[in-house]
Amino acid sequence: MKLMKKTLSLMLCLIIALSVGSTALAVDVPASWQNKWADYSKNIAPAVTMFPGSDETERYIAWYSSSDEGYVELTAKGETKKFTATATDVPDGSYRLGAVITDLTADTYAYTCHSGDFVSDKYEFTVDATDKVTALYISDIHMAIEDENENALIERSYIYNETLNAALKNADDGLDIILSGGDQASQGLTEELIALSSPELMKTIPFAPTVGNHDRKSIGYKYYTFLPNQADLAFKSYIGTDYWVRYGDALFLMFDSCNTSMMGHYKFAKAATKANEDATWVIAVMHHDMFGGREPWLNSENTLLRILWTPLFDQYGVDMCLYGHSHYYSVSDVIYNNKTKVDLEDKNEITDPAGTVYLSTGSVNNFAPLLDDDGNVPPVGELAAFTYLEEEEPLYTLLDFTDDALTVNSYTVDDSENIYSLTISKSDKDGGHTFRNTKWYMRGFTYFVSVIVNIINNSDMYNRYKDQGFDVSLYEGLIGS
């Protein structure tokens, strides 16, 4: 308990210092957000966050606590239910509590989190009665503590809050789920993730993150997240794994692309699609860009990732893959077997495409350069159908799902400019997919290569986490230490 109080005191001092420092804000943060941030930082420990359950009938609620016991109190139509939380030990001596709210129906609910002397604010959310599902896609949020900018967290959390609010305002029927393509936190620190939870919408709309390479720089993500249907991979990242979520007609496959052990990813995709055979839309969400281009120094890595991942998407009929990492916005052609199946240049509507569309979005906070070191526009990927260079402005993408159409619209935050639109229609559940089964020898080669790469990655993470003083026994079996 003493360690817990000391840790929270240090974190509180850090956040307050970052929020009231004398350095001028690089971003014009209004007084309303500065006041909200000051109030939020006074009660830093909980970081209440709503994550998705298996489907719309569930919500996963998580928060930090000095107590290992707690519950969520849910109210609707005058009736109150309590959902007991389970506790996970956090290395700093605190706990991350998680409660699963079940049996939700179309209605408006209010909930509060309780643990020890802590009682959260009351948060209200709605379960939609319509069949239409609207998902918000963003990536590379990059909450960050910066040595050169003591106001970084307040500025970045404000920009993130504005991005969420802009998306909600532009969503005709509200937002059902927030999909994030990784790199939520620049250093993977708990303080950064606490800032991530500061927007009100992080407590009222389910947040579905994926693991990014920056999230792996420390272990905050491992304890911050509370997610359903997690894959038990033989080779997995220390901080997370694959999981799936089903909303309406859409199945979201949330992949940890930092983990290149493809045998586990194939096993996960097979189980998830089998459990959701009636889903019309299969959407993959991962971190690493494969087709956008713009960063020539990543060509070798992207080629390897395409060899590893695209056969899986072909085999399981993935309609769209959402990713980030490059911080550049791009949309590919319809791709099958790593080749263009349908050229999407100047097309905004397609029916029954036999392949996958890959969409990479820009960063919420870390904007990619418009020109390279030689003053040239960075080259796009050869299979990219549309690209957009953002001038230090966050983007977001809304995906609307019905039983026969997926409509994609991407916008700028500041002026809500619609930079890209695409509608994919299906005449039946399978559309044009042929579900190519990878040849056994190619799959064996892929498994072999992916395991070697994964061992190298795990070795790097093993050394990083060991230096930080964390328990690395999991890795010792994976790298033969």
Task: Name every feature range the model reports, one short phrase each.
Residues F118-G181, Q187:
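An acidic-aromatic substrate-binding cleft motif
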Residues R156-S218, Q315:
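Core catalytic region of metal-dependent phosphoesterases/phosphodiesterases
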Residues A99-V100, T108-V127, E191-D278, V282, ...:
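Extended active-site neighborhood of metal-dependent phosphoesterases/phosphodiesterases
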Residues Y137-S139, I177-D183, Q187, F207-N213, ...:
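Active-site neighborhood of phospho(di)ester-bond hydrolases with catalytic His/Asp-centered motifs
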Residues A24-E148, E392, T402-S481:
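Acidic, histidine-bearing metal-coordination/catalytic regions of metal-dependent phosphoesterases
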Residues A152, Y158, A279-C321, D333:
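Active-site-proximal segments of metal-dependent phosphoesterases and phosphodiesterases across multiple
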Residues M143-D147, A185-E191, N213-I219, T260-M263, ...:
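Active-site environment of divalent metal-dependent phosphoester hydrolases
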